[in-house]
């Protein structure tokens, strides 16, 4: 069992990053690969979940042990597979997800990709007791740290702009969409969502 991978971040994609260590490149599927764009070419460490299918052996990577643990708990929910778990963690911070489960907020959970009312209710039923003892401050991701809501919005905006810069967009192009993305980040949109919105705005010119 591989518990974590530490090495040089060789490159990243919309679904995964590749970490090279010992002459081997490990492909790690992540909730939001672009959060690691600032580490490209540098040493980094991700905690992993090893998933075996009939047709593939896959590694999933997470910034913290707590995020990985939450992913594994999501996999215990009937109807949620690895892709669904990643989509949920990409759309919300662990803090937001745990709070939604603890507060039995079905409306919030149904905003996640592929999550209907029945699945949202199942998430609450299956995870509420398992998340007793989890506190928001204990499960924040590395990107969020112990930041206030305002600081988290700024952090998400900066990471999204960094990712768009890495994709080849100029400062002038990004300046035109900065205010729009800033407002979206203040509304609670995460890094991946901001990147997608930014790309849509840039393609429209």
UniProtKB/Swiss-Prot annotation:
It is found in: Cytoplasm. One of its GO terms (biological process) is DNA repair. GO terms for molecular function: ATP binding; four-way junction DNA binding; four-way junction helicase activity. Residues 153-205 are annotated as: Domain III. The keyword DNA damage applies. The keyword Disulfide bond does not apply. InterPro entries: DNA_helicase_Holl-junc_RuvA_I, Hlx-hairpin-Hlx_DNA-bd_motif, NA-bd_OB-fold, RuvA, RuvA_2-like, RuvA_C, RuvA_C_sf. Coiled coil: none annotated. Residues 1-63 are annotated as: Domain I. It comes from the Bacteria. Its main location: cytoplasm. Gene3D superfamilies: 5' to 3' exonuclease, C-terminal subdomain (1.10.150.20), DNA helicase RuvA subunit, C-terminal domain (1.10.8.10), Nucleic acid-binding proteins (2.40.50.140). Has three domains with a flexible linker between the domains II and III and assumes an 'L' shape. Domain III is highly mobile and contacts RuvB. The RuvA-RuvB-RuvC complex processes Holliday junction (HJ) DNA during genetic recombination and DNA repair, while the RuvA-RuvB complex plays an important role in the rescue of blocked DNA replication forks via replication fork reversal (RFR). RuvA specifically binds to HJ cruciform DNA, conferring on it an open structure. The RuvB hexamer acts as an ATP-dependent pump, pulling dsDNA into and through the RuvAB complex. HJ branch migration allows RuvC to scan DNA until it finds its consensus sequence, where it cleaves and resolves the cruciform DNA. Homotetramer. Forms an RuvA(8)-RuvB(12)-Holliday junction (HJ) complex. HJ DNA is sandwiched between 2 RuvA tetramers; dsDNA enters through RuvA and exits via RuvB. An RuvB hexamer assembles on each DNA strand where it exits the tetramer. Each RuvB hexamer is contacted by two RuvA subunits (via domain III) on 2 adjacent RuvB subunits; this complex drives branch migration. In the full resolvosome a probable DNA-RuvA(4)-RuvB(12)-RuvC(2) complex forms which resolves the HJ. NCBIfam families: ruvA. Belongs to the RuvA family. This is Holliday junction branch migration complex subunit RuvA. It comes from Brevibacillus brevis (strain 47 / JCM 6285 / NBRC 100599). The lineage of its organism: Bacteria, Bacillati, Bacillota, Bacilli, Bacillales.
